[in-house]
Amino acid sequence: MVYDGKSHQSVARHPELANRSFVISSFGKTYHVTGWKVGYVAAPEHLMHEFRKVHQFNVFTVNTPMQYGLAKYLECADHYLNLSDFYEQKRNFLRSGLANTKFKLLPSPGTYFQCVDYTQLGIPESQLSSADFCQWLTKDMRVAAIPVSAFYSEPVESGVIRFCFAKKEETLQSAIDRLQKI
């Protein structure tokens, strides 16, 4: 997923990198089926041979019916060729809804998350840690967010949280309506 007229540049496009690179992806994240737990790895044979040695001891079983379902779904190229446009529209919808708030919108050029800085909202809650702010946002405003600090190995307080816009438009509009009241 890449937006704003840009295109993804995989390391696999460059022969000197492709020979020593893995391409890893998750169907779950891309196609809204996270519970299915289906992904894939592609690499040159010499790397795949080594990868399989490790993988066989990390995965007990596969979800075969879902693999068949995904294979059928992928027969129509539009399902994956139009993904960037699909998510870009959702991103733009959320961004335009938050444009006149005091949330500082950070760039979101290729993801289904919109990161925002909440520290300039001018409310007492804007002084909370990002984890506490997200709890307040979820409990009191009924909008879920994740602090980006949750993904750091060392505690970092940046005042940045992320919203997922891979949602139905009605869900996004409801969140926008609530966030505009802050």
Residue map of PLM features:
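PLP-dependent class I/II
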Residues: M1-I182
